[in-house]
Structure formats: C-alpha cells, structure tokens
Amino acid sequence: MAFTFAAFCYMLSLVLCAALIFFAIWHIIAFDELRTDFKSPIDQCNPVHARERLRNIERICFLLRKLVLPEYSIHSLFCIMFLCAQEWLTLGLNVPLLFYHFWRYFHCPADSSELAYDPPVVMNADTLSYCQKEAWCKLAFYLLSFFYYLYCMIYTLVSS
C-alpha cells in the first residue's frame, strides 16, 4: 500500500469534487428560486413587491457569477493533475466538460452573457430552463465523478 502522486490526485479530487457538487446544488436551488420568482403573478401587481423581487433576482445572479470561475478553475485543475499523473482514462472523462467550460467562457458576449448570469438574460424563460438543465447535468457528472474518484483512489492505494 504505497502513496503515489495518482493517489494524491484522486484524494484531492474527491475533496474538490464535493465542493463542485455543492456548487451544482446551489445552482439548482438558485435557478428554482428564480423560476418561482418569475412565475409569481401576485407580486407583479404591487410595486413594492416588484422592487423587492428585482433585488432578490439581482442578488441571486450576483452570487451565481461568483461561483463560475471557481468551478471552471477547479475542473481545470483536475485535468492538469490527471495529465501530470498520467491517468489517461480519468483525463479523457473530464476533457469534454473542460472543453464545454472553455467554450462557455470564451463564447460569451462582453456586455451581457449567460456566463455572467445577468438578470435580464437569466429571467428569459428559455435561458432559465437551459441553465437549470445544465446545472442538473453538471450535478450528475460531478456525482458520478465523485464515486469514480473514490473507486480509483482505493484501487490506486491497494494496487501499488
């Protein structure tokens, strides 16, 4: 039972993947709250409630913006670690999401983007639905990755 760099990579990935799972859950909850605010017809008649609702939407979008770069950075770190550890299968499983993150980051308009989660853009029903589906897909990916990393960590520790 030897401690290798690959085992260290899997251990660190487990901890960071747990953080990514919480990020994905937070995204799902935030988008669900935005969807609920979007469909509340009673509050639209009262200007006081409308201002409060708008502040709530801006607050949620601001918090969502704060989670984008850490998520992309952590996932990029996974790929760099597995590349250095020569864990090719694990790297191959992570590269599609890494490419999606790069595409999402570099193909967003400068003034208003889905990546930045601007309130007018996010409150579009199609964009909100897309973002919510994306969050569910990322949650599924991170959950599967978590258990894969756990298995690989145990296998690496036992086999070496």
Curated annotation (Swiss-Prot):
Membrane topology: Multi-pass membrane protein
GO cellular component: AMPA glutamate receptor complex; dendrite; dendritic shaft; endoplasmic reticulum membrane; endoplasmic reticulum-Golgi intermediate compartment membrane; ER to Golgi transport vesicle membrane; glutamatergic synapse; postsynaptic membrane
Keyword hit for Membrane: yes
Lumenal side: 32-72, 160
GO biological process, one term: regulation of membrane potential
Entry keywords, A to Z: Cell membrane, Membrane, Postsynaptic cell membrane, Synapse, Transmembrane, Transmembrane helix
Transmembrane segments: 11-31, 73-93, 139-159
UniProt tissue specificity: Expression is up-regulated in dorsolateral prefrontal cortex of patients with schizophrenia (postmortem brain study).
Location in or out of the cell: Postsynaptic cell membrane
Pfam families in the record: Cornichon
Main location: membrane
Function: Regulates the trafficking and gating properties of AMPA-selective glutamate receptors (AMPARs). Promotes their targeting to the cell membrane and synapses and modulates their gating properties by regulating their rates of activation, deactivation and desensitization.
Subunit comment: Acts as an auxiliary subunit for AMPA-selective glutamate receptors (AMPARs). Found in a complex with GRIA1, GRIA2, GRIA3, GRIA4, CNIH2, CACNG2, CACNG3, CACNG4, CACNG5, CACNG7 and CACNG8.
Protein family: Belongs to the cornichon family.
Name by which UniProt lists this protein: Protein cornichon homolog 3
